[in-house]
Amino acid sequence: LNIQLLSSNILNAVKFKLLLPETRANLNEVLGALVLRKLDFISPETFQVQTNINGVDSLMLFQEDARKELLERNKRREGPLFEGDESLLWSYEKFGNHILANQVLSRVTNTNWFLKGKNSEAITLASYERLQSAFLQSAVTYEKGGSIITKPNQQSDKVFEDFFFIMSAMNGAHGLTMANRKFYFNSFSDSFEPIYYDGDLNFLRTSNVDEMILRNAFRKDYKFSYHAEFA
């Protein structure tokens, strides 16, 4: 269920989803979102909540939408938000969605911020161009058997490799396809950051990330940056 509160808020969120726990592996989603936030990735407030909908009591998962409030909660200033544009997936019926899942471009999701003024327009358009270029490069590289990781920042920036690593460790392959990705552009650091959403995380099952993809995903000298957090 997509919910919008016309008055008041829940933990500052006015737009959020109520999800059936089994569609997000229940507490796996709650724990995964918390782990990512503790590692300073942008991650939505997610928790179990008792609800009464049309007279039916049920346990649901609360998850806030990717909006201004999500950025503020994660100590980021409001800026351009993007996601994979899934329209291509539904345009070619003879192809299965999984075939085109990494052959998409991005789209802006917070158009209200874009319309605030000339500065926000310029920042959004410039970052949009950079992200589109990264999506195209990622699609070409992946088709040639290279890394599947989309890298819209400088090559020395490891944030997207780190995100791919921790998502893979939590069996979140679903959230790594380009069609399911969300991004925030930080104008102060002039760089993109990944936003966690819909990873289909599961800490108990066997890895669902293709071994060949893992083998080609990282640079040879890659090391996960955040191991000290859990030492």
Predicted features, each with a name:
Residues 1-13:
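Compositionally biased P/S/T/G-rich terminal and signal peptide-adjacent segments
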Residues 8-10, 23-25, 56-58, 67-69, ...:
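Solvent-exposed loop/turn segments at secondary-structure junctions
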Residues 10-58, 126-159:
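A conserved hydrophobic secondary-structure block that centers on an alpha-helix together
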Residues 36-41, 165-171:
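Sec-exported extracytoplasmic/periplasmic mature domains
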Residues 44-50, 177-184:
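A short glycine-rich, hydrophobically flanked beta-strand micro-motif that places a catalytic Asp/Glu
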Residues 67-169:
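ATP-dependent phospho-/nucleotidyl transfer catalytic cores
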Residues 117-125, 129-150, 158, 171-172, ...:
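C-terminal catalytic region of ATP-dependent kinase domains
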